[in-house]
């Protein structure tokens, strides 16, 4: 009788156990970290040292998968619809919140929705900078605005894609200043920077990490930042707000997973990422790019992300419909 009850109990326990219970020993195979942009951009530059540190901590390979397209929507959708088992992660940028709002604006089905993801950790967060070629006559933001107003639509800015992390803050600036620039969208941060360095555009709005080497080499110049105060590494560069323009925008990168990833897997990834951001390669890589780490653990990150996404939804509505050329 007792033996029968024990067996019955085991059968019931097995029946109600979570589907992931048999695979508690995570990770047991390589992990893919998707970057929704080509190499050389903020997401890629953030992902690679983090992946290296995670490999050592988790004792499994962590492969970077660059899956570019549609300003990040292709890679974001890939992860949103992947099996939620912890083996497909995304190094997301701020644009992950923007693109579903753009789909709504244009009345089309979204490639993904933000609630298909859960945050593991925010890695960095930085204002964007208005960056121009050093061989232009613009030494200050006033120089740039005055010239742009004299010849609307002639100055070209490149971006990482329509409504991407480099496009949205430039639209905010154009609305706040009344200038009209011509837009050259590309497929990511790397191609965007190649465009300005190659003379195909004269300006970009980007986190300083993508521009720092070229600023130090004398090829590019910083005019203003989208924060509320000067950036520590460049105290001489004023904020748009301090110059009278209502432009405030934070470019961030964070590690996220499909929303139904088992809690025990998320915990392992949270703990590992918390340790990873303290590793030398992560600290050094951010220091070289003049980008401070701005780590947030999952709970804090998800709450912050919700508020940031709400703010960006309002920004998208204010920007309105923008076509591929302006």
Report each predicted region and the residues it spans.
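A ligand-binding cleft/hinge motif common to bilobed small-molecule-binding domains
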Residues: 95-107, 167, 171-176, 203-235
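Short hydrophobic/charged patches on amphipathic alpha-helices used for structural packing
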Residues: 76, 142-145, 193, 212
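Short beta-strand->loop
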Residues: 115-122, 180-185, 202, 213-248
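Bacterial N-terminal signal peptides
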Residues: 4-15
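N-terminal (or domain-start) structured segment
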Residues: 20-116, 154, 162, 178-203, ...
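An extracytoplasmic/periplasmic, membrane-proximal ligand-sensing/linker region
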Residues: 28-30, 175-179, 263-326
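Beta->alpha turn/N-cap motifs
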Residues: 91-96, 159, 188-189, 206-211, ...
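Hinge/capping helix and adjacent helix->loop/strand transition within the periplasmic-binding protein
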Residues: 22, 54, 81-87, 100-191, ...
